[in-house]
Regions:
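Structural signature of extracellular appendage/secretion-system components
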Residues: 1-219
Length: 219
């Protein structure tokens, strides 16, 4: 998706094309400072480049908002998986012997697999077939009772605005932020990095190009 922001190299609306056209116009103007046609070409190509930068900036913000929405959906998936695991543990404790346990264990395993896709987790045995689930950073997701994640998206997420963080309330009611030290990898961590690091860095690069364009146009 990030590559699509710039356009296919050499395409008419691609950033490299409009930038090269602007650079060529500046060179022509430098060779013929009094030429009206050269000045007009600089203005036209500068406008084209500015328009391209604005379009890209809009795509960056759209992508940040998309990432924010995806974080919310992923948090809801985590909560659903943890609720399934808690329910499975309750059923397992009530089932006599091996009767009906296989289906419940299968459901629990599927929920664990879903969690492993969304977050970096470590599953440990607690005895009597019970399990505990932590993130590799140490956050307790399940230990007899399911933790619950919370997330409030910021919409619209405009340039320069910070996105919301993820909170966690464990099974005993203790709340804490689920920061990057506790959530190191997985789909949610990747979305947070995209929203808070990768895309803002791209926006800063666009801002730097726009500032350089303004300086060049004023010289």
């Amino acid at each position: 998706q990030l590559d699509s922001f710039f356009g296919a190299p050499g395409a008419a609306q691609a950033l490299d094309t409009v930038f090269n056209e602007f650079s060529a116009a500046l060179s022509s103007l430098a060779a013929e400072p009094a030429g009206a046609a050269a000045r007009a070409e600089v203005i036209a190509t500068a406008q084209g480049l500015a328009g391209g930068l604005n379009r890209m900036a809009g795509k960056v913000q759209d992508a940040r908002n998309d990432a924010d929405a995806a974080i919310r959906a992923s948090v809801e998936e985590v909560n659903a998986a943890l609720a399934t695991i808690e329910d499975a543990e309750r059923q397992l404790a009530a089932l006599p012997g091996g009767h009906g346990r296989a289906d419940v264990l299968d459901a629990r395993d599927r929920a664990i697999d879903a969690l492993a896709r969304l977050a970096d987790i470590r599953v440990s045995e607690r005895g009597a077939g019970r399990i505990a689930i932590h993130t590799t950073g140490g956050a307790v997701l399940f230990a007899g009772k399911a933790s619950r994640l919370t997330f409030e998206p910021v919409h619209p997420l405009v340039a320069g605005a910070e996105g919301g963080g993820i909170g966690m309330t464990d099974g005993e009611g203790h709340a804490q932020p689920l920061h990057s030290g506790l959530l190191r990898s997985g789909e949610i961590a990747g979305l947070l990095a995209l929203r808070d690091e990768t895309l803002p860095a791209l926006q800063q690069g666009l801002d730097a190009v726009a500032a350089g364009l303004a300086r060049a146009a004023s010289e």
